[in-house]
């Protein structure tokens, strides 16, 4: 239900009227409440009783809605008897009521600064309330200096000292021209642009959960560590020029150090380069190598959601096969139909057919046909200090079968290992079932 109230000449769209002395003779026998719409239901009248009856007010106590204590200020002080009721206002429709322009008189700054009421204007002198306000814009920001004897703060809320449980928050939730004291005081976005997202929030106020993700991007400084040529007067030193973006660093490296087509010496002079001054046969190979030092990766994966980037176009081409499912490299061994996305994986697979085991463990000299098997085996050595189980490596591919290991072992260790294995089997019967088919029951 939309409640249509009359605000008088000061606040024509607030709809709170009937507080002038001209209507006191009409309210002698009933409560002086809000000037409700005559078309509203009578049952809603009790919900808007904001002040005590007029005959209950003593000479020293004033209602929150009398002109002497309200935010109407001096304009109502001089024209208190001219505040009309709802019947005096001509509203053709609800649209006229909601969109009426509030261009009528504004309270004087001297009176508005000293009087604080329910509908006081909070702006600085000479500035009116912005259009599009709520019907009840909120209470005045109550501080320790503004708290009156008729109001007190309970649990962060201000009690108005009226008849009825009417509470209002001390901070109005509206756009005000005056500085605010809440956590979003800098929400005016006066420093907003695409590079500066800081809200200039005061140090004593914490930022909201949303603004912590709007931090200013960290400025990047990339330094060139190319060793310049030494002369008789100047020893060899690094370039040490700094750049704010990768594009600027790459452009500098291409123009200043790598050189153009006339450059025949394709040597990397980056500081502490492991090549040690060894030259490349072609310029493009030097360019690809320099990306190892600069960290440039100019080839992103075009498939949405992947997000991987690569330093070489060849690596991107191989990676895209994981999305397309293309496997152009077929196993050359007769009778094998395995296919692979790159030639290196095919080469690793060929060791299965040739029985070659080029991947050797440096700890125990065991060899394997695939590097993944060697990596699994290395985990056994890493866990030997904490895991004393003799069957820790039983699930890994090994060059020597377990039976041969026990046959080649020394005689004194046979009895001890057999006894130890028997004890472990009797002790771990509850952990490892004798038949692995029981896992699938």
Curated annotation (Swiss-Prot):
Main localization of the protein? Answer: nucleus
- Name by which UniProt lists this protein: Zinc finger protein ZIC 3
One CC-aspect GO term: nucleus
Q: Which residues form a coiled coil?
A: none
- SMART domains, alphabetically? ZnF_C2H2
Q: What induces it?
A: By dvr1/vg1, activin and t/bra in the mesoderm. By heteromeric AP-1 (fos/jun) during activin signaling. By increases in Ca(2+) in the dorsal ectoderm, triggered by planar signals from the mesoderm. Suppressed by bmp-signaling. By pbx1 and meis1. By zic1, zic2 and zic3 but not zic5.
Q: Which family does it belong to?
A: Belongs to the GLI C2H2-type zinc-finger protein family.
Q: Which keywords are on file for this protein?
A: Activator, Cytoplasm, Developmental protein, Differentiation, DNA-binding, Metal-binding, Neurogenesis, Nucleus, Repeat, Transcription, Transcription regulation, Zinc, Zinc-finger
The record's function comment reads: Probably acts as a transcriptional activator. May bind to the minimal GLI-consensus sequence 5'-GGGTGGTC-3'. Can determine the ectodermal cell fate and promote the earliest step of neural and neural crest development. Involved in establishing left-right asymmetry in the embryo.
PROSITE patterns per the record? Answer: ZINC_FINGER_C2H2_1 (PS00028), ZINC_FINGER_C2H2_2 (PS50157)
